[in-house]
Amino acid sequence: FDKARGPGGRIVSKRTPYAGVDLGTQYFTARDGEFRAAVDDWREAGVLASWPVTPRVLPEGQPARAQARLVAVPRMSALARHLAEGLDVRCGVQVREITREASAWSIQDRHGDSLGTFDGVLLTAPAPQAQSLLAEPSPRLAARAVEAPMKPCWAVGLVLDEPLNLAFDAGFPSSGPLG
């Protein structure tokens, strides 16, 4: 179940009349061997490509650490759609409650209607949202979710009339309120 209009969570993309904009994850890296194997499969499927950009650390302008950065094509949300193929993913559904009943999990939507019973539950929501869903079935996990550190990432999507004349395509602020 995904409360958004489509699958993806943090790899969300938005379409505007002018361009598609990745507002969640702008790119990702793959260092773990098993994950790299999955990435290779996604590349072969045509879902991923290398991001040919070397971000700069700002304001110094030095190149960021060299590493392979990957993007989904044509937008980041394409990876979520690819992973969801063949699955029963229900979008636009907000889960309100998860309860344990005997050997199964019962899930209700925001209106209190049953979404069914399941053998297992996997939560990918940010910790503050997961905390409220975990409060009844696992107070211990709910308490851990409250303590989980959150590291926000700001993304700005701009569509300009003319390209900016900058010496870099992407930047990582190293000081100030965003650094």
Predicted feature residues:
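Central helical "cap/lid" subdomain
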Residues: 8, 114-176
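A conserved short coil-to-beta-strand element within the FAD-binding core of flavoproteins
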Residues: 91-106
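Generic structural signal for small/hydrophobic residues in well-ordered secondary structure
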Residues: 2, 28, 83, 122-124, ...
